[in-house]
């Protein structure tokens, strides 16, 4: 069984037992969180597609950890002007483990 849910402006395809990195959520490590913005739920033979959300669809997950992603380097450069600017950014994330999916 798998589901597609929305969190942090992004859509994630998950199955029970998978670990997913989401945009940072203000939830303590070890707590359980429920996602109710489920767009699709499918088991072996049936597929429930929401319009836009699946009625009664829910994805339950446990927060594993919080952290920061690898650094992304941004370089701005102006040709022939001896000007360049180098910046970096590390995005915060929350890692969750999917425990249950229901339609």
From Swiss-Prot:
Keywords: Ribonucleoprotein, Ribosomal protein, RNA-binding, rRNA-binding. It comes from the Bacteria. GO terms for cellular component: cytoplasm; ribonucleoprotein complex; ribosome. SUPFAM superfamilies: L21p-like. One of its GO terms (biological process) is translation. PROSITE patterns: RIBOSOMAL_L21 (PS01169). PANTHER family: 50S RIBOSOMAL PROTEIN L21 (PTHR21349), LARGE RIBOSOMAL SUBUNIT PROTEIN BL21M (PTHR21349:SF0). InterPro entries: bL21-like, bL21-like_sf, Ribosomal_bL21, Ribosomal_bL21_CS. It comes from Shewanella piezotolerans (strain WP3 / JCM 13877). This is Large ribosomal subunit protein bL21. One of its GO terms (molecular function) is structural constituent of ribosome. Part of the 50S ribosomal subunit. Contacts protein L20. Belongs to the bacterial ribosomal protein bL21 family. This protein binds to 23S rRNA in the presence of protein L20.
């Amino acid at each position: 069984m798998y589901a597609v849910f929305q969190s942090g402006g992004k859509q994630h395809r998950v199955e029970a037992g998978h670990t997913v990195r989401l945009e940072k959520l203000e939830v303590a490590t070890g707590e359980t969180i429920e996602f109710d913005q489920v767009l699709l739920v499918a088991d072996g033979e049936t597929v429930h597609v929401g319009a836009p959300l699946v009625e009664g669809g829910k994805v339950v997950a446990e927060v594993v950890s919080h952290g920061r992603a690898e650094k992304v380097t941004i370089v701005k450069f102006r040709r022939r002007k001896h000007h360049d600017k180098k910046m970096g950014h590390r995005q915060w994330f929350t890692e969750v483990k999917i425990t249950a999916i229901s339609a």
